[in-house]
Amino acid sequence: MIAVYNDLLLAADSGQVSALCLLDLTAAFDNVDHDLLLLRLERQYGLRCVVLRWFQSYLSGRSYRVIYVNWTSSIVYIVCSVPQWSVLGPRLFIFYTANLADVVQQYHVNFHAYANDNQLYLHCRRDDMMSVVDRLERCLIAASHWMAANRLKLNAEKTELLWAG
């Protein structure tokens, strides 16, 4: 986020305004498709054999149940998600969503991501703000389609557009 903040300050110093779009993904870590993640780890990052099987073992076989006073729910097996509060969870999410940057960059929009915190931003002159909004809107539509194809969901109600400068 410091890099984004610095870019916004530099743009303001040069007399430009910046549109900053803060993306909110609904239950981001809970929707990571294990098979798709493992396929990406293999094809995009070159993980093979023992290392790939280790990740497969880490992701599979997880379950949970709720115990409350004298009541216990049935066991539910987890077929997708990465553990959010683990050391690996945010990193695996970054690997899973790395291709989103390619989608965003097709629209010449700056993109910064840390785990499930994603920011899109552009700088422009004040008289060019409407074209920036149009480009961001087209970029968000494409990003939303990519997310849907990858079992993720952009929460439009919590996604925010801010102007700075």
Give residue spans per PLM region.
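Inter-domain linker/hinge segments that demarcate the starts of reverse transcriptase
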Residues: 1-12, 130-150
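Short amphipathic alpha-helical interface segments
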Residues: 16-19, 108, 155-160
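Generic beta-strand/beta-sheet core signal
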Residues: 21-23, 114, 121-123, 157, ...
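Active-site palm subdomain of RNA-directed nucleic acid polymerases
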Residues: 11-13, 90-127
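Short, conserved phosphate/pyrophosphate- and ester-handling motifs at nucleotide-, phospho-/glycolipid
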Residues: 85, 89
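Conserved pre-catalytic core of RNA-dependent polymerases
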Residues: 1-83, 122
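Short, conserved micro-motifs composed of acidic
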Residues: 138, 149-165
